Each structure stands twice: as C-alpha cells, then as structure tokens.
C-alpha cells in the first residue's frame, strides 16, 4: 500500500481544523467589543497561539510530499496547483492572526475609526484573508473529496474514515478523472513548449 501520513501529522492537521473552526465561530462581530479588556486579552492570546501553531504546522508539514499516499504518479501541473493552494492557505492563516494582532494594537492605541486609513487597511487585509481562506479551504476539501471518489489513495493517507481500497469502478468518476488527466497533460505540453 502507498505511504500514509504519520499519526502526529494527522493529529496536527485535524487539531488545527478544530482550532480554525473555533476561531471562525468565536470571532467578534463589532470592533467596539474590544473595549472589553478581558475579550481583548483573549483575542490577543488566541491570535498569538494560532499564529505560533500555524508556523509550527508549516515547518512540520512541509517535510511531507504534497500527494503522500498517491498510488499513481501525479502530474507536475497538479502538484503545482496543489502547492499553490497550500501556500495560499498558509499565507491566509498567517495573515489572519497577524492582522488581528495589528487591529488589537491599533485599537488599544486609540485607532477606533474603521474608516481611518491605517485601521481600515488592516481590517481590509483581515477580511480578505478570512474570505480567501474560506475559498482555498473549500478547494482543498473539494479536492480531497474528489480524491476519495477516485480512490487514488491520497484521502486515505490523511483522513481516518471512509478509506478507499483502490481505484473506483464508477464510470462517471473515471470519465471525469480521464478528462482531468488530459487537461494536466495539455497544460504540461503548453508549459514545456514555452521553455523551448
């Protein structure tokens, strides 16, 4: 059978999913809520821990192949796309707590006008990072689900449930997968011709 992620990498991955989910659920609705010193301190501590964990997670997880568990060779274009999505997710997950800490710092320094240049910019970065993280995570989850449907082994290397036992026999999924492979092959030919 193909390689699988280690138990520690699975724990890090799924614990972080819970932490991210908690961060979304507990987010503040209005900047004026930061007038509550206890809430402000909690937000600063949460953002600091979140940031440290994102960086530690990145440093730990980068040692693993992008498609660990794949039973078949993965096209280079697919690898680059996946790495781009992963890099984007990490960038968003670093910008979220960083901009959150900047918002808290600006707020404590008296910058409470959300329309102000500096605070408005930082709030914009924070909101954009959150929105982009939703999109990139949705792409990541969608790709993982498609991997499970294809039965290519990638899902099984990280997800502890609904493990696949081999490639699918479903003709519809096979057709989509074949089209996907053709697109990757055309993209590789395109980029190879540009290098010449």
Name what the model sees in each region.
Residues 1-196:
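Membrane-embedded alpha-helical bundles that constitute the cytochrome b-like, heme-associated redox core
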